């Protein structure tokens, strides 16, 4: 059976059974771009580090860290060194941005729109959970962010990771983001495949 990592072709490095979030889905050649939404169980730090490594081996891409945690340079160095001796060159390929508010996230998406590169976004909803910001404003900014994500996906592959949490806000926000995605992989499917096929770490 053909087993491929469920990462869009334009973001995908060489096939490897240890690639992040391998699934039984067959990967098609997506037209121009693709918006993939993936739920995760918590932060998934080791797996996300591996995903960033695989994308960096493939080429340059935008990396937007929604929360305070992207892997540090030492962690990425150790991960990349397992695959290539061109460590410094590979480390420079992710263009890391760290918005501090949902408004800054919107600004970053507008900037990324002009760069024409694949984009990986970690913990997309993080700043939308800020209760100090009026909910109606968060709703409005989220709608605008989703519009820009959809626009970005016309010409580039976009991967958005969202840790699933049992909150009212998550249940409110997730359908808005899901409505613009080309493909959604829920956390249950990821773990069913991990248990049944051993395709994940």
Predicted feature residues:
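Phosphate-binding/switch region of NTP-binding enzymes
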Residues: 152-201
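Conserved nucleotide-binding/hydrolysis micro-motifs of P-loop NTPases
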Residues: 69-71, 100, 126-127, 165-167
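Hydrophobic beta-strand segments of well-ordered beta-sheets in folded domains
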Residues: 33-37, 59-64, 116-121, 155-163, ...
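Phosphate-binding/switch loop-helix module in NTP-utilizing enzymes
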Residues: 99-151
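Conserved P-loop
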Residues: 30-107
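A short acidic (Asp/Glu
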Residues: 73-77, 107-108, 131-133, 170-172
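Pre-Walker A adenine-sensing motif
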Residues: 14-29
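Charged, amphipathic alpha-helical linker segments immediately N-terminal to NTP-binding catalytic cores
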Residues: 2-12
């Amino acid at each position: 059976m053909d087993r491929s990592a469920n990462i869009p072709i334009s973001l995908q490095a060489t096939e490897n059974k240890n690639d992040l979030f391998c699934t039984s889905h067959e990967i098609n050649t997506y037209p121009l771009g693709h918006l993939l939404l993936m739920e995760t169980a918590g932060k998934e730090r080791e797996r996300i580090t591996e995903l960033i490594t695989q994308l960096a081996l493939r080429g340059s891409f935008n990396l937007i860290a929604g929360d305070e945690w992207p892997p540090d340079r030492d962690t990425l160095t150790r991960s990349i060194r397992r695959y290539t001796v061109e460590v410094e060159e590979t480390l420079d390929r992710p263009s890391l941005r760290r918005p501090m508010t949902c408004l800054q996230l919107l600004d970053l998406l507008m900037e990324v729109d002009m760069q024409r590169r694949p984009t990986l976004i970690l913990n997309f909803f993080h700043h939308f959970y800020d209760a100090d910001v009026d909910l109606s404003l968060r709703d409005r900014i989220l709608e605008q962010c989703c519009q820009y994500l959809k626009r970005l996906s016309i010409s580039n592959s976009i991967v958005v990771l969202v840790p699933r949490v049992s909150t009212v806000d998550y249940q409110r926000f997730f359908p808005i983001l899901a409505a613009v995605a080309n493909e959604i992989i829920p956390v249950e499917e990821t773990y069913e495949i991990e248990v049944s096929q051993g395709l994940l770490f």
